[in-house]
UniProtKB/Swiss-Prot annotation:
It comes from Ceratitis capitata (Mediterranean fruit fly). It comes from the Eukaryota. This is NADH-ubiquinone oxidoreductase chain 5. The chain crosses the membrane at residues 4-24, 44-64. Its EC number is 7.1.1.2. Keywords: Electron transport, Membrane, Mitochondrion, Mitochondrion inner membrane, NAD, Respiratory chain, Translocase, Transmembrane, Transmembrane helix, Transport, Ubiquinone. It is a multi-pass membrane protein. It is found in: Mitochondrion inner membrane. The keyword Transmembrane helix applies.
Amino acid sequence: MCSISFLVLVSISFSMFLLSLNFMLNEYCVFLEWEVVSLNSSGIVMTFLFDWMSLLFMSFVLLISSLVIYYSKEYINSSY
């Protein structure tokens, strides 16, 4: 189970890294608004901003998370 999580996180991290390079070279910026809840006439909106720096940050966070999962698997296996 840990190896599947590790591989999924590494692959998403790699794709985020490539996507950040694409955004940087083409100067893209995606602004996404999602209305989470709508009560009567008011709503709660969640806003996302995706640019090259945020995608690069997410790729490194996912890479570090995958390495933590890999290390924990190795640490648990070595204790027995």
